[in-house]
Amino acid sequence: MIINVSCGNFEQSIRKIYIDEDQSVVGVTLGEGSYLVQGSLEFGGSQCHVLIGKYSSVAHGIKFIVGLNHDSSSASTYPFQEVFEGMLDKNAYLHPQCNHCQIIIGNDVWIGAYATIMGGVKIGNGAVIGAGAVVAKDVPPYAVVVGNPARVIKYRFDEATIEWLQKLCWWNWAPEKIKSCWPEMENMEAFKEKYRKIPTMKISEECQELQNVIKQFKEEGYQFYYFVPDLLSKEKIWQTVLSKFANVTDKKILFIDMPADIPSNVKMKFKQLINSYQQGQLVLNQSSEDYTSKCIIPLMDYIVTTKEADSSFIADIATSAKVKILYGMDEF
């Protein structure tokens, strides 16, 4: 299926582009300030999604191609199952084993006109995608890529500056602060001089205790999957993720970080559901704040994303900590 996608305003809010008339299935999520002039989302099922961070600039003529890979490892790449079982008119999700159904675009990314972004690609903060590029592999933060297939031709800044920007995370500042300092951003040296010192994150005793427990389990060979459930979403990706861990018998733990803004009645019902699991290894953390994510995610083996904007925030932390990123609707 192909739909046109556009979000040309610069609002300081999270915006979603839906792929259905009922506005229950999200195709694109944009963070604060980001805009998408015009493009197309070509997708193989309702699982498919594009996650865009904050203050990213996406030009016109963009193609997002997600969930449309055919199985090249079988005797034929022809979609026999879809044809013989009459699934073609149902927007069938083709071959989950060979598709990655989310694109993640970081913060402060600039994507030039007529670029094509393939499913499963993760574009790092500050990257520049040249006009007409075909991006089939991940793009590092602040890299400039061009061509088909897209290749890195340079980086916007030296390694030390990129590391500093990744720690600074100016895109997470309050809009008022960004507005007041944007003239300084025009002069990179002045900007670096003013904000060179980045405050050290203070870790609470609660976080330290949690870190120690996680480290003990990891020493015993356990793998941790970090997940913020989309409890207020109509799509309920959290149900799919929980089902993957409901009956695991190997050393895998789903660490569930409850969003701080969830209504208390929803939290209570979710907690009761977690407690009802007789098998599986699920851990529920109920005091989720930004600092908690920052001190816990670096200890994880994986994070699991949804279609919600908070997945962009945790993916950013995971990228800096070199933690692998999985999409909740993909097979893993």
Task: Please describe what each predicted stretch is.
Residues 80-117, 149-217:
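C-terminal segments of enzyme domains that contribute to small-molecule binding surfaces
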